[in-house]
Regions:
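Carbohydrate-interacting/catalytic domains
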Residues: 17-67, 73, 295, 311-314, ...
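Sec-dependent N-terminal signal peptides
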Residues: 4-13
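Short, solvent-exposed turn/loop segments enriched in Gly/Ser/Thr/Pro and often Arg
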Residues: 67-79, 119-128, 191-197, 220-224, ...
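Structural recognition of the beta-strand scaffold that forms the well-ordered cores
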Residues: 33-36, 65-70, 117-119, 187-189, ...
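Short, solvent-exposed helix-loop connector elements
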Residues: 285-292
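Active-site-proximal helices and loops of the catalytic beta/alpha 8
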Residues: 181, 191-276, 295, 304, ...
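Substrate-binding/active-site clefts of carbohydrate-active enzymes
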Residues: 18-49, 53-65, 70-183, 203-210, ...
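Short glycine/proline- and charge-enriched loop/turn segments
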Residues: 81-90, 152-159, 236-244, 327-336, ...
Length: 436
């Protein structure tokens, strides 16, 4: 008995002395701070290992979900080098690394407190996909019996899948389960979700929900029925487009409040829109620095977009104010050491966003204005007032009545101040995050 107790004591000491492995928790959709990873801005070859070396800088932004753009084997036949032209749903792209490299990267994300979701391209495959030869009936055919690309698009590098085929659906769901079981990922961002039938998404999401672990499911689309299919989040395309109209065409800031209301009025209570000022599609045409009137404009747009409500998305490169377009078909190195003051500003903003529940999902009280986004966020005893000048010139705006003359804390400058009795003046693209 004494020997047994001695051995148990030794075993307990060994366990206690081992370093604790940091865990992660899949965030609630309302708490998501997502980072979109385009491997080709990290390295031309071996991106998995290079991304691993950047995780601390990404995590310092309070990112809790890493979204990897397609990391699958790409097709060659009729291809245009798009990562969304997939040859094998169960194989990694060799130029990024090996399956073991990817597993290590996912494990490292988890150790640092970040969940991982992968891009899932359900709508189409490459023309030389492993299904093509053995299962031509899994694809859409035209009147002459030829396999076609997706209708209504110019995506001639990909072949359209036939969702009337039950076997194809099951094979796809099996492939989706593969990455959860084999690599331990935590969900999917489902590409071109508006192109895919509702009943397939319902079948697929139900199947994923039946797996032992909780998963995050994001639809790249704006159909209201995505939530009926079981998705947690979908895209806030309308808000982004309204934002561009405000910054590029001097539209009234009122349209941002109107668009926010319309987006949330059409989805079930408790569901979440993913908010962003850029992503790989948008940055392929223009960088956010170009789209929003410069670095200061891009940050102002980010502030009113993220703090209004919804999940938050950063596109890798945004945090260093990369000034050029990024064609995601090709390697384009980003200097991660550039513009450290911009990185630090994003870090401060997201630290506040992560720390205060009111700033993420507090009650929204909006004060309509033409040139300034003015809104309050309340939760329990937290009360914040945000003012964002959406113009590249000085603007004065009315202060909400109950904030006039109040002593507040300027959260970005870490100073205390007394607000004026009626109006406040903001410099071009200036913003304030004020706490009572």
């Amino acid at each position: 008995m004494k020997k047994l107790l001695f051995l148990l004591a030794i075993a307990a000491m060994v366990v206690a002395c081992q370093p604790k492995k940091k865990g992660y928790t899949l965030p609630d959709p309302h708490d998501v701070i997502m980072y979109e990873v385009n491997p080709l801005v990290f390295a031309q070859e071996g991106a998995f290992n290079v991304i691993a070396s950047r995780l601390d800088s990404i995590r310092a932004l309070h990112v809790n979900v890493m979204w990897f753009m397609p990391t699958y084997e790409q097709g060659v036949l009729k291809a245009k080098d798009s990562p969304y032209c997939i040859r094998d749903y169960k194989a990694v792209n060799a130029k990024y690394g090996t399956l073991d490299d990817f597993k290590r990267l996912v494990d490292l994300c988890h150790e640092k407190g970040m969940s991982v979701i992968m891009d899932w391209v359900a709508n189409h495959t490459s023309w030389d996909h492993v299904w093509m030869a053995d299962h031509p009936d899994w694809y859409t055919h035209d009147a002459e019996g030829n396999i076609t690309w997706p209708a209504g698009t110019n995506w001639e590098d990909v072949a359209d899948l036939n969702f009337d085929n039950a076997d194809m659906r099951l094979a796809m769901i099996d492939a989706m389960k593969y990455w959860v079981n084999e690599v331990g990922i935590d969900g999917y961002r489902c590409d071109a979700a508006d192109f895919v039938p509702f009943d397939f998404w319902k079948q697929a999401v139900d199947s994923m929900r039946a797996m032992p672990k909780r998963l995050l499911m994001l639809a790249e689309g704006k159909r209201a029925d995505h939530f009926d299919a079981g998705f947690d989040m979908n895209y806030s395309w309308d808000y982004m487009n309204a934002n561009r109209n405000v910054f590029q065409r001097d539209s009234s800031a009122l349209i941002l409040l109107q668009t926010d209301y319309m987006e949330y009025d059409t989805i079930p209570k408790g569901k979440v829109k993913l908010r962003f000022i850029t992503n790989h599609d948008e940055a392929a045409g223009h960088s956010p620095v170009e789209e929003y009137g410069g670095v200061r404009g891009s940050i102002a747009a980010f502030v009113e977009t993220i703090f209004l409500r919804g999940g938050a998305l950063l596109y890798g490169s945004q945090e260093v104010a990369y000034p050029e377009r990024l064609n995601f078909f090709h390697w384009k190195p980003v200097n991660w050491m550039s513009n450290p003051e911009v990185y630090n500003e994003y870090k401060t903003l997201l630290t506040l966003y992560n720390k205060y529940g009111a700033l993420k999902w507090g009650q929204l009280v909006a004060y309509p204005a033409v040139d300034v986004m003015v809104f309050e966020k309340r939760y329990e005893k937290q009360d914040f007032l945000l003012l964002v000048n959406v113009r590249n010139h000085e603007v004065s705006t009315l202060i909400p009545q109950e904030w006039r003359g109040k002593k507040v804390k300027d959260m970005m400058r870490d100073t205390k101040k007394e607000l004026p009795s009626r109006e406040i003046t903001l410099q071009p693209y200036e913003y304030f995050i004020l706490k009572k």
